[in-house]
Amino acid sequence: MTTKMFYDKDIDTKPLENKKIAVIGYGAQGHAQANNLRVSGFDVIMGLRPGKSFDSVKKDGFEVYSAAEATAQADVVMMETPDELQAAVWEKEVEPNLKAGSDLGFSHGFNIVYGLIKPNADINVMIIAPKGPGNIERRQFVEGGGIPSLYGVHQDPTGDTAEVAKAYAKGIGSGCAGILETTFEEETTEDLFGEQAVLCGGLTQLIEAGFNTLVEAGYSPELAYFETSHEMKMIVDLIFEGGFEKMRHDCSNTCEYGEMLNGPRIITEESKQGMRDVLKDIQDGTYAKKWLAEYNSGLKDLEKMRTEYKSGLYEQTGKKVRAMMPWISDADKYSTAADTEQFSAAK
């Protein structure tokens, strides 16, 4: 099946014009989307809980209200709080104040797909899912570009929800990169699988396993870090630009032969079965139940794992290596103040 890609020239922003947009939450995506929409000429207000971010958003020049107050004023409400908090914010503040015929948007379908949020039938429900972190989304926009987004419709009582979703995606800058249609279920399943099996879970385990293999064999941790982690960005950039073909073309013949010969020794049938098991847990709701139970228990296991990883040799070596290259930190100029503060504290 061929998926149509929409660009700026294909999308009319009129369905979103003259509508007040309330972005609920000012984390990475909320920050990027609200700022990009405002620059694109849309009427944006923020809905937040009192706290540091409330004051930070005011300094950024937005009108700031509670989530309930922002929802009551808005025609479009975009849920940008963390997945694990959305159901509570929805139940207490958004649902009681959402007008019939309003557009309710999400950047990830978790709460809709797993039944944690169930909007009334008279509410338009859409997804606009940027395919990248918020700071990159903001950076690309400021530099004149954008990142691709997916859009989809869950409920459409007014008949124009898809057009509103595409206009929103254009407003955050995705029209110059490409906008693709999806469904809530497809976006949620593929996003969770990609994160867990490949982009984050699979990749971090692969990198650390390679690092440990070299160190255990007596090689320098710093050089092992360069070989298994630091160079990863350059290899991924080649794949990003031209797929595996460009990566193989730009690497040596020695590298290419070794990659094709020995790659299957690393990603074995057992690894592939593990991926299928991860996918099944996402599809049948097992992972969602585990994650919500973990959150409701106070994140004890997650905090334990975070502590273990931070104290490990790989992370400690990475800090030493990155300290030798201070220019690396200059690349991250578009995180929210809260993100930067949290990351600095973690370091």
Curated annotation (Swiss-Prot):
**Where in this chain does the record put each KARI C-terminal knotted domain?**
183-328
Listed GO CC annotations: cytosol
Reactions listed under catalytic activity: (2R)-2,3-dihydroxy-3-methylbutanoate + NADP(+) = (2S)-2-acetolactate + NADPH + H(+); (2R,3R)-2,3-dihydroxy-3-methylpentanoate + NADP(+) = (S)-2-ethyl-2-hydroxy-3-oxobutanoate + NADPH + H(+)
- KARI N-terminal Rossmann domain span: 3-182
Q: Which UniProt keywords apply?
A: Amino-acid biosynthesis, Branched-chain amino acid biosynthesis, Magnesium, Metal-binding, NADP, Oxidoreductase
* Annotated Mg(2+) 2 binding sites: D191, E227, E231
What is the designated name of this protein? Answer: Ketol-acid reductoisomerase (NADP(+))
